[in-house]
A protein has these predicted regions:
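Extracellular zinc-dependent metalloprotease catalytic-domain scaffold
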Residues: 1-72, 78-251
Length: 251
């Protein structure tokens, strides 16, 4: 995840996440980045990853009460959210129509990038997605006009999912009786699609009127503070580790 990873000699039966607080780009820029660096061979399940956070943004996150939400968001990237969705050396290919600016067929905000994992799809339909008319389901971020290119392909589409924790921006509504950035069953389902054992009971209450697609300018007019999380998906080298300790690069 950009964090410094020490030499390891121990056995890992779950996942190890290294954490680092460092200057990145000053206040109000990239708040952090995260991703896996080692995965279990033949799976899309992380073994070791890292998270780093910009020391110049910590006070802002703390003042907004967002630190826990941001850490959870970045942990999900370590587990493969937006990273293990597709790749020639991965067992799954769930990302359709990637929003890659280097692709001549990509049109900003128009290419209908979406996630096709069956569990996430079923959960999306279950919470109102059967009314979604904006394109294919489950919609993935395809527009970098409001946020940076780093938001593409690695988050749920902000204009559709709004405050959901794995959308492109973190929200603050100031109401202590509501959850600012809920963890939806769609996100949990996406991890089941990656092969993880999940608990849907851990989801927060979250329903959307998916037939309504929010215009970015209207979202900005809500005067609800948001923290831009684009650029937080670390897409560096990833290696797979076999049960015998054999290591090979897969990305």
């Amino acid at each position: 995840g950009g964090a410094a990873i020490p030499t390891m000699t121990e056995s890992v039966d779950d996942v190890i996440i290294y954490l680092e607080f460092v200057p990145i780009d000053g206040p109000s820029g990239t708040v952090g980045s995260a991703g896996p660096c080692l995965t279990r061979s033949g799976t899309a399940q992380s073994l070791v990853g890292g998270m780093r956070f910009d020391t110049d943004d910590l006070e802002t996150l703390d003042n907004f009460g967002l630190m826990d939400d941001i850490v959870l968001h970045e942990m999900m990237h370590v587990l493969g959210f937006g990273i293990f969705w597709e790749g020639s050396n991965l067992p799954f290919d769930y990302l359709e129509l990637p929003s890659d600016p280097s692709n001549p067929e990509y049109t900003e905000g128009m290419t209908d990038t979406h996630f096709t994992g069956p569990e996430a799809t079923a959960q999306f339909l279950a919470i109102g997605g059967d009314d979604y008319t904006g394109g294919e389901i489950v919609p993935v971020e395809n527009d970098d006009s409001e946020y940076s290119t780093g938001s593409l392909d690695g988050h749920w589409r902000e204009s559709v999912f709004d405050e959901e924790i794995m959308s492109t921006a973190a929200n603050v509504d100031g109401d202590p009786m509501t959850i600012d950035n809920p963890l939806s069953v769609v996100t949990i389902g996406s991890f089941e699609d990656l092969g993880y054992t999940v608990d849907y009971g851990a989801a927060d209450p979250y329903m959307q009127t998916f037939s309504v697609v929010l215009d970015p300018q209207l979202q900005a007019a809500e005067l609800e503070p948001v923290i831009d999380l684009s650029g937080d998906v670390w897409r560096g080298p990833i290696h797979a580790v076999g049960a015998d300790g054999t290591v090979r690069r897969i990305r």
